[in-house]
Design a protein with these regions (language model features):
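Histidine-centered, transition-metal-coordinating active-site segments
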Residues: 1-193
């Protein structure tokens, strides 16, 4: 139970979701602009992954070495440069992250109606004075889910007094993991404040 609560309160908190998806949109914009031929300032390691389509098959020792060099500095240094760039969308997304002025995130139990998303897209396009296509960087929806306990993937092991390691389900007859094994899905809507 604590695991599920931790995920919802920390990793799947609305602020965390908002920051993560603004960053995802920002990186998509960086990739889009780079593929259009625009030269954006960024570290060598980040540039490699932005300019190339890396798959499981193409992930070689060179890609691994560059991947190992990536850290938050690559992103932060990019954000600090891109916030002053001439692409308005990239600059705005960078400023949002740096200034911690993120999107509003609303969570729902069922998928968000397309009409609601379209209405918010129109409003954002008007407010920001940009085409609806670009407003989709600031208004979007999706789903998140959490399964607190998956015995087949990430079982919890208990070290007993008898020096044995057993699964938590066998360690206690008190543990009803059916409830924890249930996947909980929520739908999010990110939009301007």
């Amino acid at each position: 139970m604590a695991r599920r609560l931790m995920y919802w309160q920390v990793y799947l908190h609305k602020t965390s979701i908002g920051a993560e998806f603004v960053l995802v949109k920002l990186l998509a914009r960086v990739k889009e602009l780079t593929h259009q031929g625009k030269k954006l300032p960024m570290t060598t390691a980040l540039r490699f992954f932005v300019e190339n389509h890396i798959t499981k098959e193409t992930f070689d020792t060179h890609a691994l070495a560059l991947f190992a060099q990536l850290d938050d500095y690559d992103i932060i240094s990019g954000l600090k440069e891109w916030q002053h760039g001439d692409d308005w969308v990239l600059a705005k997304l960078s400023q949002m992250i740096l200034n911690r002025d993120l999107l509003r995130v609303r969570l729902y139990r069922s998928p968000v109606e397309k009409e609601k998303v379209q209405e918010l897209l129109r409003e954002a396009a008007e407010q920001l004075q940009i085409p609806e296509e670009l407003a989709s960087y600031f208004v979007f929806t999706g789903e998140i889910s959490n399964t607190a306990y998956r015995k087949d993937e990430q079982n919890i092991l208990i070290y007993t007094k008898n020096n044995k390691i057993i699964d938590v389900t066998k360690a206690s007859d008190q543990m009803n993991l059916d409830a924890l094994a249930t996947k909980v899905t929520k739908y999010y809507l990110c939009s301007l404040k």
